[in-house]
Amino acid sequence: IDAGRAVTLGLILTELIINAQKYAYDGRPGPLRITLSESDDRFRLVVADDGKGGHKAGKGFGSMMIGSLVTQLDGRIDYRDLAPGLEVALRARIDPASDLA
């Protein structure tokens, strides 16, 4: 992954961690599972918590920023209620130029 996409991915990860801290555990400490995997020409970033669940993408600044950053990656983000907890999965191409080949 190139440096620009890595920075964008880091910003998304940071915002997902902040959101989990704020909403899943109401500002208290709690466990998070973070995985980054690769398959073919795509990567998948997953952030999951064991919090109260039921929370999804909001309409606040952080959620809007995540949406904008995901668009920059030409990716897709999915929210899945684990009851309890939430799993957020981001998928995108590692190298978007591979579409042009």
Regions found by a protein language model. Name each.
Residues 1-17, 21-31:
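Conserved short strand/loop->alpha-helix "switch" segment adjacent to the catalytic nucleotide/phosphoryl-transfer site
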Residues 31, 53, 82-89:
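Glycine-rich nucleotide-binding loop
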Residues 31-41:
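Short beta-strand/loop element within the Bergerat-fold HATPase_c
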Residues 41-45, 86:
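Short beta-strand element(s) in the Bergerat
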Residues 49:
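Acidic ATP/Mg2+-coordinating residue in the GHKL
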Residues 55-81:
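ATP phosphate-binding glycine-rich loop and adjacent ATP-lid/helix-beta elements
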Residues 90-101:
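C-terminal end segment of the histidine kinase catalytic
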